Amino acid sequence: MVDNLPPLEPSLQNLVEQESLKWIFVGGKGGVGKTTCSSSLAVQLAKVRESVLIISTDPAHNISDAFDQKFTKVPTKVNGFDNLFAMEIDPNAGLSELPDEYFDGENEALRVSKGVMQEMINALPGIDEAMSYAEVMKLVKGMNFSVVVFDTAPTGHTLRLIAFPQVVEKGLGKLLRLKMKLAPLLTQFVSMLGMADVNADTLSQKLDDMLRVITQVNEQFKNPDQTTFVCVCIAEFFSLYETERLVQELTKCGIDVHNIIVNQLLFLGKSHNSCSMCASRYKIQEKYLDQIADLYEDFHVTKLPLLEKEVRGPESIKTFSENLMIPYKPKETAPM
């Protein structure tokens, strides 16, 4: 009987030990501590993987604050680590977010292709954000990181990030069909401008290369051996509601999800003399923890504490990250 099975390990140890994982998304409602959790997971992965990259797709870019170090759109080594790198992208910026080096080349075609591609993409509603993800994926795959952790924006953006391979595949198909019709005109136009080495094939080669990578990424996203999603929530109604919606959407998209982090919990021992507000919050959290236990009995549910101080800086994150591997137990306070 299923009811007789022991509960799953209340930690992220299963993810850290799963060597086949290539992409790990961490997401949930705003304000639940996603960045702290994703940064802590990246730190633990760095202990067992050759190279780890954490990418922030949230325009707020909180990982710079978390590690107390400025990150950019180029992967940068995190201070205090040899194999942990971080980068921040703004999906709303489209192709302009890409490093300029991506479009460098010996001929004029690559130098003008960025602007031309941006104009072509703007003609397809909804694809701009997806294309920025696509180009980042293309860059990241070329760097061969062992595993990539995504610190995602709140739920709506996250679902678009998950769906971007399908959007890009559909959009690039349209662009390539359009290219077949416009190729003679484009070649004639650039020749008039004196750029003889620019042709439609040069531009479309970028699109062909990207489509090949995105098709591969799309397959990997649907493979539970290579991709999983970690939902972060707090023990409150709206956060739990958002988490359930996210789990359902991820399941619909074919994305594996079997880990939930419940963050910012009060751990009040029997001997703990708490204030009335703390006691009240504790009761509310216990109610929603019971609901989480019922809803997600086949999930690994990790419980993390609400701390007196912010988790900020490499050393602080290293210490806090241990709670992802070993279930947190509060220190008992002596009765007064």
UniProtKB/Swiss-Prot annotation:
Question: Matching Gene3D superfamilies, A to Z?
Answer: P-loop containing nucleotide triphosphate hydrolases
Give the record's family classification.
Belongs to the arsA ATPase family.
User: Where does the record say this protein resides?
Assistant: Cytoplasm; Endoplasmic reticulum
Q: What is this protein called?
A: ATPase ASNA1 homolog
GO CC term, one of those recorded = GET complex
In this chain, ATP is annotated as bound at K29, G30, G31, V32, G33, K34, T35, T36, E236, N263
Q: Which HAMAP family does the entry link to?
A: Asna1_Get3 (MF_03112)
Q: Where is the active site?
A: D58
Q: How does it assemble?
A: Homodimer.
What CDD domains is this protein classified in? ArsA
Quick one: which residues bind Zn(2+)? C275, C278
- Top-level EC class as recorded in UniProt: hydrolase
